[in-house]
Structures are given as C-alpha cells and as structure tokens.
Amino acid sequence: MANKKRNVRNFSIIAHIDHGKSTLADRILENTKTVTKREMKDQLLDGMDLERERGITIKLNAVQLAYTSNKGEDFIFHLIDTPGHVDFTYEVSRSLAACEGAILVVDAAQGIEAQTLANVYLAMENDLEIIPVINKIDLPSADTEKVKKELEDVLGIDGDDVILASAKANIGIEEILERITEVVPEPAGDGEAPLKALIFDSLYDSYRGVIAYVCVKEGSIKVGDKIQMMATGKEFEVNEVGVFTPKTVVKKELHVGDVGYLTASIKNVGDSRVGDTITHANRKANEALPGYRRLNPMVFCGMYPVDTNDYNDLREALERLELNDSSLQYEPETSQALGFGYRCGFLGLLHMEIIQERIEREFGINLITTAPSVIFEVEKTDGEVLNIDNPSEMPDPQVVEQIREPYVEATIMVPNEYVGPVMEISQKKRGNFIDMQYLDDIRVNVVYHIPLSEIVFDFFDQLKSNTKGYASFDYELIGYQQSNLVKMDILLNGDTIDALSFVVHRDFAYERGKQIVEKLKELIPRQQFEVPVQAAIGNKIVARSNIKAVRKDVTAKLYGGDITRKRKLLEKQKEGKKRMKMVGSVEVPQEAFMAVLKMDDN
C-alpha cells in the first residue's frame, strides 16, 4: 500500500489564455503514450464543442497517465487541466486543491500577463511546488532571456530552474516529465485512515445518475462501499469507480492520491455538491476536508425562453449546469415584457455568454437575455438596506437615501506606449488611479479602482482595441462605495419596458439616455403606427425619438382626380391608425435588450 502511494504525482498546468496550456497537455499525453497517434487531436482535453471553437478551456479535466522515468522507476501521474480566463478562476482553485504541483506556462513572446500572476498566487496559497516553463521558444518573436528575467523579478523564480520548451515542436517535454518526478511531492495521506475524498467536479448521466469526480485524500474506496456525503448526510452505495485516461477506465479500487470518478445511483443533482467530502457511512472521518469557498456571482441578467412552453426545460437545463458549475445561481422572475424566466448570476461576461450558449446548444432552448447588471446596495430613507440585482426593482427615487455600488481593483498589464489610452479608458469609466509599477523597460502594471458596473459592459473590449490587443487584465472585488446613481426607464409607446431599465451615473444619464433611444430607434422594426421611444428618470423624460410609421399608399388607386377624394382616403387611414395605436403592441427584437451593452462612448 505504501509503495502504491509513493509514486503518485498530482499536478496541474496554469497559464494565461493562449500561452499554450492545452497544447502542452496534448504533448504530455502523447509522450507518456496515454493516447495513441491515431486518437490524438488538438485540444484533446477540451471536450466541449464550445471549448474547441473558442480555443479556450472552460471546464477542468483530470487524466491518469503512466510514466517510466529515466532511472527506470514507474510513476502514476494525474494531470488536471485548468482554464486560464479570469471568469473561471474558481475552476482553477478547485483543480489546484486536488494537486501537489503546478506547471507554470509562460509564452516566450508575451511574457507574464495579469492572469498568470493571479493563478501563480493561487498556487502559492495552496503550497504547490511550481515548475516554471517558458513555452513557444521556437517563435521568431521569442525572447527567452527577457521572460526569464521577468520570472525572476516579478515572481522570485530562479532563472536556472526554468525549462525552455515548445509544446508544438515537442521540445523540452521530456525534461518537464522528469522534473515532475523529482520535485512534485507525493500526496500526503494515510491509506489506512477513514476515507476522505474531495468532490471537485460532477456531471449528470441520464442512465447512471450523478458521476462525481473525486480526489482521494485519505483511505481508499471500492465498489460496494457504503458512503456518506458529509455536507448533506445522505448515504449511497458505490456501484462503480474508475479513472480517466481521457476515456473512462473502470477500476476495482481508488487509493490515496488517486484522481478518478465514482457513481452510486445518486439521482438528485443537489446530493453531490462540488467541494463536499465523501466518507464511509460505517467508519466516518472526524472532520470534512476544507472545501472551496463559495463564489458569489458578480454579474446578473434575466434569461427568458422565447417559447413560453420551454420554461420547465430551462429550469432543468439550469439545474444540470449548476451541478458542475457551483458559481452559477438562478431564481425565477417574471417580467411584464418577457413573461416567465430566471434571474441568473455569473462570475463575469464570458461566463454568462458560455452558459447562454450551452443552454442553446446542449438543451435546444432559444433564449432572450437582458443586459447584465450588478448588485447595488440601496439604503432607504427609513434606514432599510436592500440588495438589488435587477434595475427594474429599484425603489422610487423619493424614498432612496443613498445607493452604493461594488468596486473592483483592476490590475492592467500593458506595454508602456499604451499607458495613456489605458488611463484614459479607466478615467472615463469612473476609475480612481491607485498605483503604477514598471516591471521592466517595456511593461507596466497599472492599478485602478473601478465600479464593477462599468467593467461589465465593454471595458475589456475597449481595452483590447485601444492597446492593439496587448493589454491583459485581472480584477477582484474590494467592496462597496457610495455613488450618485439613478435608474433609467425606457418607454415604448408610453409603456415602461421593465427588461430595458438600467442604472447609470447621474453625470452620464442624459448622454446615455440619448444614445440608447437612438440605438433602439434603429433596432426596433417600424410598425403600422408611429412609436415614441423615451428615456426617463423618475417622471422626467430626458430623451425622446420617434419610430416612423410604415405607410400604406392608399391613394395609389386614384387616377388624376380630385384632391378632396385623396384627402378623404388619407383621413380614413389616419382614423384606422389611431384605433390601431390604442390596441397595438410593439415587437421588440433580442438585439434591443442588449443595446444597453453596445453603447459606443465616442
């Protein structure tokens, strides 16, 4: 048993987006002969269609590899692949909790970027052994010496420890594998102690129920064992355990340090919580493993099925997605404009887009989503404090004492020639300048405190387009601050459309109102009658525009003839339109709900 544990190595790969993490994982699978040449395809571990299309990793993945070192020792590796995007930090923290080591991949041409730093700090918090790798050294623009110096200066990593590699050209992979055997510690844990296994992910299979991905920290688990979930106290009998070599391979038993899966006829999605500890029902562990901190969503939006009959299917889809995405939150809500739907909370805009696309693809439900918003703290004149994530629920301005909004600390890394544009964008977004550090002759780290509601819209897009794509960006919540905010309502044909309401700073309200009214005028199709589009704060209209009516030429059949006859027909048409306007309702396309997002600041 001791021998079994001695040669297990659990590690993950951390990197900024596009620094070659998934390609390196592919090479490691190839070089350890885990996957044959015939089965190999790019981004092998990114199983979701979405991941392959966008070229990003969204879900973490775990694979078992067998490796024989140059000294002839046999090892079992567990590689846990992690996402690099700021929205998926929780996926990274979950996978790092199951490891003892991390390969830090840095692009030889790009150098250290904001999310590289964020992930390294996470790894250091988890006391992981870090193996630094400079990737893409075969690129013409590679500057390995500069990147080595950056690693030394910024992260305090010894330049001599850095492995130079190119995952694409298969350079340095062997050295990385050898280094893992030398420096990554074996999993600490007692094989004879009561079982403690951490659930770090799970998915739902309609035949087998919930499949839990587990990392065994102490004890062992085999088919037929009675297990208990420590958070819920529910008991189950294990009917299958196994590991992934990306394909699932059934095993008799999982030991200390193993990363694999188990099924136990768990039919209810809520019974297998990510971050929970599994133990034996008849020989319980004294205390649960420290799980994951529950992440609070930062961005909210309404999701409504286009076809109202899909409402229950949408609930089921959200339940399934919540199973392995613990940061997704949702609750039912109704809108006068859109009917029944859900108010959903996400970690960021990319997270929101991905969930929306997964619902549309995997469950075939057409959605209308409203523009995203954040949680505002509203203090009323009677002292009551409300947390409001839906702008249409903002109380009347007369009863509001003050509104506080969430602020984030934004860390922006950028080449020094673009510091000007970055500061300009940040100031425009109501940011407060905090700090600026030169990492070397070329790269600058700029820190701002910015309201989250400004970042939610198009901050990242503007940052990228004004720095030719060179800026990288990471942010974390720092708390709430009072701001002079107002709720803006949009009226179509005199009716308030609740799903189009948004919260805006009073200084920009007039300008924003004008922009959105013009935008909606372009997006909403012309009706048979004239439709006024208005933006209002409370009872005060701040902007208005009219969508002109489509006019049928009623006089076409007249030939020459009398002007009074013409007038009579036009009067008759006008009467008809008046009637229609009273009963007419305006069709609003999906683009109109997102118009709030696409405001150009020019």
From Swiss-Prot:
SUPFAM superfamilies: EF-G C-terminal domain-like, P-loop containing nucleoside triphosphate hydrolases. Pfam families: EFG_C (PF00679), EFG_III (PF14492), GTP_EFTU (PF00009), GTP_EFTU_D2 (PF03144), LepA_C (PF06421). Disulfide bonds: none annotated. It catalyses: GTP + H2O = GDP + phosphate + H(+). One of its GO terms (molecular function) is ribosome binding. GO terms for cellular component: plasma membrane. Its EC number is 3.6.5.n1. The keyword Nucleotidyltransferase does not apply. Belongs to the TRAFAC class translation factor GTPase superfamily. Classic translation factor GTPase family. LepA subfamily. NCBIfam families: lepA (TIGR01393), small_GTP (TIGR00231). Required for accurate and efficient protein synthesis under certain stress conditions. May act as a fidelity factor of the translation reaction, by catalyzing a one-codon backward translocation of tRNAs on improperly translocated ribosomes. Back-translocation proceeds from a post-translocation (POST) complex to a pre-translocation (PRE) complex, thus giving elongation factor G a second chance to translocate the tRNAs correctly. Binds to ribosomes in a GTP-dependent manner. This is Elongation factor 4.
